[in-house]
A protein has these predicted regions:
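Conserved ABC transporter NBD signature motif
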Residues: 56-64
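Conserved signature/switch motifs of ABC ATPase nucleotide-binding domains
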Residues: 133-136, 154
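Catalytic Walker B motif of ABC-type/P-loop ATPase nucleotide-binding domains
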Residues: 159-162
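A short, surface-exposed alpha-helical micro-motif characterized by mixed small hydrophobic
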Residues: 201-203
Length: 266
């Protein structure tokens, strides 16, 4: 379980996080949504240990990350996986070598064992034929799949996704979401997913958290966020939905088939 308690963070006198708190239960993926510039990526970097809060605490299975020595934090990060906006692949390495990199750097596996694991993971993400390609030779969707394979190669307990579908077309967005969903079901990790893809992400997450003005204003299921009486949350959701989804919401009760809400776009 991850517990984020009353995080505060300022940059150059500007307070970005103003007491943000969130709990992520084991096996749950939480979508972190909210207006642009509200600090969602900053929040995620605190959870990963890349930033330290001005005040507040972050617990992973009861252990306070903010109180760990550097060596302890590095060891704990090995249980985390990260998927960044740009994928962060090494341009000079093939897809195979990118995915193998964490195993070569952080384990004592033989090259034979590494090869078995890398090829198996590439198969899982649909890149079995792309092991010898370089990032410049990949489409946007393929690059995200390669980055996801690298993030998953050590079977992390926690996955952190920072807008993993930014810049992709709707069909590729849908395929990446399906891949995240299938890998979550396969590996059972807990996770936080920062996204502006509403309502698509609601189809496969267990909870939704709404970050607004530095605090987590709402936490609930995808169904509950559509039913909330909080006008700020409701207005944000309505402003994020396309017109066909709004008509859909007015006509039928909430359901998780977001493809229907999108008018059948897959």
């Amino acid at each position: 379980m991850i517990t984020i308690d009353n995080l505060h963070k300022s940059f150059d006198g500007v307070e970005v996080l103003k007491g943000a708190s969130l709990e992520v239960r084991d096996g749950d993926v939480v979508a972190l949504i909210g207006p642009s510039g509200e600090g969602k990526s900053v929040f995620l970097k605190h959870v990963s240990g890349l930033l330290k809060p001005d005040s507040g605490r972050i617990f992973f299975n009861g252990k306070d990350l903010c109180g760990l020595r550097r060596s302890e934090l590095v060891a704990l990060r090995s249980r985390f996986g990260f998927l960044f906006q740009n994928g962060a692949l090494f341009d000079s390495m093939t897809v195979y070598d990118n995915v193998a990199f964490p195993l070569r750097e952080k384990t004592r596996l033989s090259e034979k064992q590494i090869r078995e694991r890398v090829l198996a993971e590439l198969e899982q993400v649909g890149l079995a034929e792309a092991e010898d390609k370089y990032p410049a030779q990949l489409s946007g969707g393929m690059a995200k799949r390669a980055a996801l394979a690298r993030a998953l190669i050590r079977a992390p307990e926690i996955m952190l996704f920072d807008e993993p579908t930014t810049g992709l077309d709707p069909i590729i967005v849908h395929s990446i979401h399906e891949l995240i969903d299938s890998t979550h079901k396969r590996l059972g990790f807990s996770g936080i997913l920062v996204s502006h893809e509403i309502p698509e992400v609601f189809a496969f997450v267990q909870k939704v958290a709404f970050l607004h003005e530095g605090v987590i204003r709402f936490v609930g299921t995808p169904k509950e966020i559509f039913e909330t009486d909080d006008t700020v949350v409701r207005d944000f959701i309505r402003g994020s939905l396309p017109s066909e989804a709004l008509r859909f919401r007015e006509q039928v009760p909430f359901q998780l088939n977001v493809n229907e809400a999108r008018g059948g776009v897959a």
